[in-house]
């Protein structure tokens, strides 16, 4: 007789990872000046050991990731991205929008005139 094997669902694993990362980020945040600091947990307590191991594992990872993405947050790189986006997509938008609206209006009027019976609309050239 075989016992049923319970497998951890991927969602449960993902939730656990998110919880650990959120906890690590919360521990990384600085305490505002003037606020009383909580008493430090002894390193020998179970949660103190978990905290130290998680911090030991995640601190280099967070630092390395922060250093790798520093170029993105640099004002020059971000300004260059915005300038390129403007040049590629937004330059001349006003004139393009006016031309599109003018063409759409002419097309719509032409279609409406073609649908209108001659008796009601008459000929535009006759007065």
Curated annotation (Swiss-Prot):
Example GO biological process: lipid transport
UniProt record similarity statement: Belongs to the apolipoprotein C4 family.
Protein's job: May participate in lipoprotein metabolism.
Subcellular location: Secreted
Name of the molecule in the record: Apolipoprotein C-IV
Keywords associated with the record: Lipid transport, Secreted, Signal, Transport
Signal peptide positions (record): 1-27
GO cellular component, as recorded: high-density lipoprotein particle; very-low-density lipoprotein particle
Gene that produces this protein: APOC4
